[in-house]
Design a protein with these regions (language model features):
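ATP-dependent carboxylate-amine ligase
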Residues: 1-47, 56-66, 70, 88-91, ...
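Structural motif
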Residues: 8, 72-75, 225-228, 251, ...
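Short N-terminal binding/cap micro-motifs at the start of the first secondary-structure element
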Residues: 12-15, 146-147, 272
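Phosphate-binding loop of NTP-binding sites
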Residues: 19-25, 42, 56-63, 74-242, ...
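Beta-strand->loop->alpha-helix junctions that form or flank phosphate-binding loops
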Residues: 30-32, 49-53, 94-101, 139-142, ...
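Conserved beta-strand segments that form the floor/walls of ligand-binding pockets within enzyme
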Residues: 111, 264, 382
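A generic structural signal for residues located within well-ordered alpha-helices
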Residues: 120, 269-275, 325
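Short pre-catalytic strand/loop immediately N-terminal to key active-site residues, enriched for Gly-Thr
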Residues: 261-267, 317-321
Length: 459
């Protein structure tokens, strides 16, 4: 089977491309720019085209050279030349959520949903099931050291009392209600907060979407939910198909303290993620001794409090790369960093992700950073320009919000040079090279391209 991916450099789409490569399919793909993700896929045998083209697959016009299926990222605009060509030729086209949804029907699927903690919890579950001999297929929105720095692991069916079962662990993203394409046997629901308000408009609509998602569970399905979540008392958690009720986990459980001691990754939020994983394992009757051993061995994942020690101009620094881009994620990451490095100076370099998120959650960003400053979770904060997400920004909102306005608001009550606006990654790197003395912790935070900041330290 020949499959072409439009937007193959995305973290989700690339995982699906890896899956089909492992399955022996002919994979091609395109994106706007090359990246370490596209280069890794090329090394695996995928044919990569940069940028998008009006031709498909190998670029040959002959019918037998055309792909059988085109899978595209939801971020790809409708007028994309490859998509237009595929539809004109009558080639089947599926969005990434639609394509992943088809897989969920073929597997015993465990879907991790929620505003925060999806990638880490999904990764933990994938690792634990692997250690327990369940040989799962895992499609996750980050790269895992345990899976050879890959965002995909392809497993095989295993024989259990019920017969042969194939397990699939996925992230169930709520963006644009993507998760409504998925049909899992187990749903993990971490937390629910206001996010993606450009699509949902308000929290009420977000809650409705999550409730609809839980209705996708079969009669013997299992809903595992966070008892500590402030929105847990909604009707979502009255799931009673065939008399079944949710299984809750909480930081008040006795296991919390043990997990806090054995986890390699810091932060109470990661203890919560581990509790969710432990609850899944117990639902699958995996012994606790295997679960705790697997969780103790978890090394973390790419851009999730990803710690590296580096030297720049003979200055030793600790770099923490983190994907956090929502006020709550920022809060828990800064708090965890201060707990881990109580005596070091902490610099936070934050790149807001998407104008609309920054606009709708502006007050929450201000509240979070003011609290972090008051509690000395950082010593210096640099905010760069907002990462512009192509195809998802409204011009009228772009005119209303900026990083300069965010910094001005943060400095309104007290201007002490602790919070700065520096527009670009390059200028930020140049500033840091000149001012860092060595020994500092530098947190690079955001879902855009801010993770590339260290590349500019040597230029």
């Amino acid at each position: 089977m020949k499959i072409h991916f439009v937007g193959i450099g995305g973290i989700g789409v690339s995982a699906l491309a890896r899956y089909y490569l492992e399955k022996g399919c002919q994979v091609s793909g395109s994106d706007l720019v090359s990246s370490e993700i596209t280069e890794a896929l090329k090394a695996k045998g995928a044919k990569i085209f940069i940028p998008h083209r009006s031709k498909l697959g190998t670029g040959q016009a002959e019918k037998h050279k055309l792909p059988d299926l085109v899978i595209y990222s939801p971020a790809v605009p409708k007028e994309n030349p490859e998509l237009k060509k595929a539809r004109k030729l009558g080639i089947k086209c599926l969005s990434y959520p639609e394509a992943l949804g088809e897989l969920t029907k073929k597997y015993f699927t465990i879907a991790v949903s929620g505003t925060h903690g999806k990638s880490t919890t999904c990764a933990m579950i994938g690792l634990l099931l692997t250690k327990a001999g369940f040989d799962p297929t895992v499609i996750v929105g980050t790269k895992l050291k345990e899976f050879g720095d890959s965002n995909c692991r392809v497993g095989k069916p295993i024989r259990q009392a019920q017969g042969k079962i194939q397990y699939l662990v996925i992230e169930a993203d709520e963006h644009m209600a993507s998760f409504l394409n998925y049909w899992p046997k187990i749903i993990v629901l971490t937390t629910i907060e206001a996010d993606h308000l450009d699509f949902y408009k308000n929290l009420k609509n977000i809650l409705k979407a999550f409730k609809k998602f839980t209705s996708h569970l079969p009669k013997d399905g299992i809903l595992i939910a966070n008892k500590d979540d402030k929105n847990r008392d909604t009707s979502i958690f009255t799931f009673t198909k065939n008399g079944r009720v949710p299984i809750f986990y909480s930081l008040k459980q006795k296991e919390s303290e043990k997990l806090r001691k054995i986890l390699k990754i810091p932060g109470v939020h990661n203890v919560s993620n581990a509790l969710a994983t432990l609850t899944v394992a117990r639902a699958l009757e995996i012994p606790d001794r295997i679960s705790f051993k697997a969780l103790a061995e978890y090394k973390g994942s790419w851009r999730r409090f990803d710690i590296k020690r580096v030297k720049i101009n003979n200055k030793s620094l600790i770099i923490i790369n983190d994907y956090g881009h929502h006020p709550t994620q920022i809060k828990v990451t800064l708090k965890a960093a201060r707990e881990k490095f109580p005596k070091r100076k902490i610099w936070c370099i934050f790149q807001p992700h998407q104008y609309q998120r920054t606009y709708y959650l502006f007050k929450d960003f201000v509240k979070t950073f003011r609290e972090a400053k008051k509690k000395s979770w950082f010593d210096k904060l640099i905010i760069t320009d907002i990462y512009d997400v192509a195809g998802r920004e409204k011009p009228e909102i772009k005119r209303e919000v900026s990083s300069e306005k965010l910094v001005a608001e943060l400095n309104k009550k007290q201007r002490d040079n602790k919070i700065l606006y520096i527009p670009t990654i390059q200028k930020t790197a140049k500033y840091l090279i000149g001012i860092l003395k060595g020994g500092e912790v530098v947190i690079i935070m955001g879902a855009g391209d801010i993770y590339k900041l260290p590349e500019y330290f040597s230029t």
